[in-house]
Each structure stands twice: as structure tokens, then as C-alpha cells.
């Protein structure tokens, strides 16, 4: 396959979305792209590139983004962070929030495993603590990949995706169905799945509902270039309340990109809070 044509397609998607596909990932992307080009009947990656750029951008870009998806996601990933959220962060916010809802954003939610995990934690906090039984939560889960969002809204998962889900939650928050698992309706009702391009930070300011107490953006920033990451982090700083918290993956340090957040050791993990600027 024409590797230069593949790179042109990759570079175009990167220009529009900010998603960066490393050279070592190009072979996987090339195979997926070849299948798509064959499905549509194009002769070369270059012809496909021209068609996407000038004729089919709105429809075909969705498929291209899906082809670039290489990461894995699953329920209850990095449990130390989840414990810190449930046992420390939410109680601290709740004691200041009064009767207002606690707003959580799962940015780059992919097929929804993280968002549903957050919903389970919120339900469990209310169930276990009478002090917090009155709490209301709003969870926004976003991704640029609309195919992934459609899957998230359906809420059906494989055994592999829920392999870290505590067994006591099976039957309560997920049920077996047709050889897989389906999340409970009460969880789906807690989450709004919406398309958001993290590369287009300016568009966040146009959304009136984009103010959050907690932002989760884990295993996402690694897909953006070093040039784009600081701008995305500044966007998180703007949409977080003054006493809000930002969670990134334990392998993703913000300190090499910016100093507008400060890390706080919390239980067995680190989270970030805003430095006021």
C-alpha cells in the first residue's frame, strides 16, 4: 500500500482533530485504512484522501477517527484514583456544593466504560453514606469518535471490558445478556454522551453547561502532539470550578507541559487542582 498516501490521510485527520498517530502505529492504521478504501472502491489512499477532504469530510471523518482508535478501555481502570474520587474528592466538593449538582466530565470517554464506572461510584457513595444521600450528579461524557459514542449509549460490553468490575456490582449495575453484559438503565440516565473535539478548545467556551467540579481525562492526552497538549490543559483549567479536580492517567504528568495545575498526593495516587492565574 502507498505509505505516503497513508501518511497524507493520517496528517489530515491530525490537522482536523489534533489526534497524533505515531509512526509505530502507522502499520495498524494502514491495514484498517486499506479495508475501508476497498469497501468504498477507491484505487489509492491518495484518491481516498482527496475525496474525504473535498467531498465526504462530514461523513467519512467519523470512520477515519474510528480507524485511528488503538487504545483499550475497561471498567474500574486505575482503581486508586477511583477510591480517591469516592472517598475524598466528592465528599470535599459535596460539603461546599450545597444543593447544587456535582458536575463531572469524562473527556475522551471512548465507548463509555469510564463514564459508567463514575456513575457507579456516585451511586455507591450515596448508598453508603446517609450524609450524601441527597447529592445530585451530572455526568457529561464526550468523545470525538461518534461511532464509539453510539456504542457507549447502548451500554453493552464484553466480559473482558468488565473484568475489573467488583463482582458485587454484577446484577445491580450490570446484567448478563446474550453472552455479554448490559449496564442498568439507572446508570444510562445519569450520563449524557456528546461529541466534543478536544482539539477545538475554543468551542468549549460556547457551551453554557461546560463548568465542572471534576474532569477525568485519562489515557487521552498521549494521542495529541506536545504542541496541542498545553492548550487542552488550559481549556480544562477554564472549565473547572475554582476548587475543582483534574484526573489524568498515572503515567501522564502535566508538569512537563504547564504549571497552571498543581499535583496533590491523595491516598495512593495523585490528582491535580488549579493554580489560580
What are these regions (language model features)?
Residues 92-98, 124-132:
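Alpha-helix termini
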Residues 107, 128-216, 220-228, 254, ...:
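Extended basic-aromatic, gly/pro-enriched interface segments that bind polyanionic ligands
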Residues 2-105:
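Conserved AdoMet
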Residues 230-242:
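A short glycine-rich, Lys/Arg-flanked "PGG" loop and its adjoining helix->strand segment in the class I
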Residues 257-277:
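Core SAM-dependent methyltransferase catalytic element
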Residues 100-112, 140:
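Conserved class I S-adenosyl-L-methionine
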Amino acid at each position: 500500500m502507498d505509505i505516503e498516501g497513508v501518511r497524507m490521510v493520517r496528517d489530515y485527520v491530525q490537522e482536523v482533530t489534533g489526534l497524533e498517530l505515531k509512526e509505530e502505529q502507522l502499520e495498524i492504521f494502514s491495514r484498517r485504512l486499506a479495508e475501508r478504501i476497498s469497501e468504498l472502491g477507491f484505487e489509492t489512499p491518495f484518491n481516498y484522501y482527496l475525496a474525504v477532504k473535498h467531498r465526504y469530510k462530514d461523513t467519512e471523518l467519523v470512520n477515519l477517527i474510528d480507524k485511528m482508535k488503538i487504545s483499550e478501555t475497561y471498567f474500574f481502570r486505575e482503581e486508586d484514583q477511583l477510591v480517591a474520587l469516592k472517598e475524598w474528592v466528592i465528599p470535599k466538593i459535596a460539603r461546599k456544593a450545597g444543593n447544587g449538582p456535582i458536575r463531572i466530565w469524562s473527556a475522551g470517554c471512548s465507548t463509555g466504560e469510564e463514564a459508567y464506572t463514575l456513575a457507579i461510584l456516585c451511586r455507591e457513595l450515596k448508598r453508603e453514606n446517609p450524609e450524601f444521600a441527597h447529592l445530585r450528579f451530572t455526568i457529561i461524557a464526550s468523545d470525538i469518535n461518534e461511532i464509539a459514542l453510539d456504542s457507549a449509549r447502548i451500554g453493552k460490553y464484553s466480559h473482558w471490558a468488565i473484568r475489573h468490575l467488583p463482582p458485587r456490582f454484577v446484577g445491580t449495575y450490570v446484567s448478563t445478556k446474550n453472552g455479554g453484559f448490559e449496564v442498568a438503565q439507572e446508570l444510562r440516565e445519569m450520563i449524557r454522551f456528546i461529541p466534543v473535539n478536544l482539539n477545538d478548545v475554543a468551542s468549549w467556551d460556547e457551551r453554557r453547561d461546560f463548568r465542572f467540579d471534576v474532569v477525568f481525562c485519562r489515557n487521552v492526552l498521549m494521542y495529541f502532539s506536545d504542541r496541542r497538549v498545553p492548550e487542552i490543559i488550559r481549556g480544562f483549567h477554564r472549565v473547572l470550578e475554582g476548587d475543582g479536580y483534574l484526573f489524568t492517567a498515572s503515567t501522564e504528568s502535566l508538569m512537563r507541559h504547564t504549571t497552571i495545575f498543581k499535583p496533590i498526593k491523595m491516598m495512593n495516587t495523585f490528582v491535580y487542582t488549579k493554580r489560580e492565574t
